[in-house]
Amino acid sequence: MTVLTDKIAVVTGAGSGIGEAIATLLHEEGAKVVLAGRNKDKLQNVANQLAQDSVKVVPTDVTNKEEVDELMKIAQQTFGGLDIVINSAGQMLSSKITDYQVDEWDSMIDVNIKGTLYTAQAALPTMLEQSSGHLINIASISGFEVTKSSTIYSATKAAVHTITQGLEKELAKTGVKVTSISPGMVDTAITAAYNPSDRKKLDPQDIAEAVLYALTQPKHVNVNEITVRPV
């Protein structure tokens, strides 16, 4: 028996990169997985690699609260519960404050901060009612380390850290766990546009393994934060 047999997991941003790697690994470990993201074709491509009776594609824009609410309802209607939610949807744009690209700021705030909050508020009522569940937010090293072109992105990921820390306190003694995972540079299509090819990068699978580690700790153990860096 695999370690997540019959657990029901929702993964946002599951159409590519880190989200795809997480969804695939959770499925390999026995979970029934709901794939969420904006691009239905990409989600379906991921789903086609998995057993069809244990995967569900739900196109979802995490900046739309109603769509996120519906996502959680569909997960429960399809598989009969909700055990794991991975907030992997994210947006990284190279946008300085002094570039004055307010539309880019709004977009990152909507995806990275509001998307995290909308997903939490949609999942937590069920988890609290059943006194179990695990919410994992994919943050970033950039939430701790700022470059001259990452101010807005770094601020949004710092917010994800703060949200996770606050939730840990709010959820204490409820049986519901919450974790943030902060990757360093990961080799994805998003990062390829902004970073030199010779810079050391993690593989998306490395982040998926960190997620699995957090999920498979004993019931009385909550891993609040994991930082993953390339060496």
UniProtKB/Swiss-Prot annotation:
Q: Please indicate if the UniProt record lists Oxidoreductase as a keyword.
A: yes
SUPFAM superfamilies from the UniProt entry: NAD(P)-binding Rossmann-fold domains (SSF51735)
Binding-site residues for NADP(+), renumbered to this chain: 10-34
Which residues take part in binding substrate? S140
What's a Gene Ontology MF term here? Answer: oxidoreductase activity
Q: Which CDD domains match?
A: SDR_c
- EC number(s) stated in the UniProt entry for this protein: 1.-.-.-
Return the similarity comment: Belongs to the short-chain dehydrogenases/reductases (SDR) family.
Q: Which PANTHER family does the entry mention?
A: DEHYDROGENASE/REDUCTASE SDR FAMILY MEMBER 11 (PTHR43115), DEHYDROGENASE_REDUCTASE SDR FAMILY MEMBER 11 (PTHR43115:SF4)
Protein name, UniProt field: Uncharacterized oxidoreductase SA2266
Q: Which organism is it from?
A: Staphylococcus aureus (strain N315)
